[in-house]
């Protein structure tokens, strides 16, 4: 049986408990002063990598978590280290806007550099819901891809993944190397204790740039506008039945 080198891709997003607000120019979500966290789907991927490390033990040669962004993304990397990931690295892209294709290119170069043979990714990010990075990375590497995994098993060099589909479940298998994108049903991420959090604050982080990886970042898409969902329900208070009937007629409901 071959050794397993796991790479987990993660993304920094607006905390899922917060309601997004649109900036003044209506071209993006305003992140100024907002709490940022690890994308929940990425957190599932991190947890699964740690569980593999715990259960497969000597077979896991390396666990590496990678994110592409600015130095402001370092806290989520340290969070992953505190939970049990072995190493963490930041691909510093500065102020550049990243599209899924650029992220896939950066991950491909990192996979090849680190000789990873199992990649875990969240199936989507809650900010753009693109669902694209995993598929693009699989195509670039020529690896099999398991999407929206709700159960994962590794038996020898075989990866067995169950995913939920309409009205049931589908189980697929392939051999390493492979890419898995994770669904929220796969596991429940752990919390790191204070001692591990403090230790992770002092842990070294790998630093790379797109140039180090031989990747050129091109922006092919331009955001034209961003808007909040249209309010479909109106709350109208009435004082009597007659007023209610009148209001319903005015709205065309009667």
From Swiss-Prot:
Q: Which GO terms describe its molecular function?
A: electron transfer activity
* BP GO annotations: fatty acid beta-oxidation using acyl-CoA dehydrogenase
Required cofactor(s): FAD; AMP
What detail does the entry give on cofactor binding?
Binds 1 FAD per dimer. Binds 1 AMP per subunit.
Any one Pfam family match given in the protein's UniProt record, by short name: ETF
Q: Which SMART domains match?
A: ETF
InterPro entries listed in its UniProt record: ET-Flavoprotein_bsu_CS, ETF_a/b_N, ETF_b, ETF_beta_N, Rossmann-like_a/b/a_fold
Print the keywords alphabetically. Electron transport, FAD, Flavoprotein, Mitochondrion, Transport
The identity of this protein, by name, is: Probable electron transfer flavoprotein subunit beta
Q: Which organism is it from?
A: Schizosaccharomyces pombe (strain 972 / ATCC 24843) (Fission yeast)
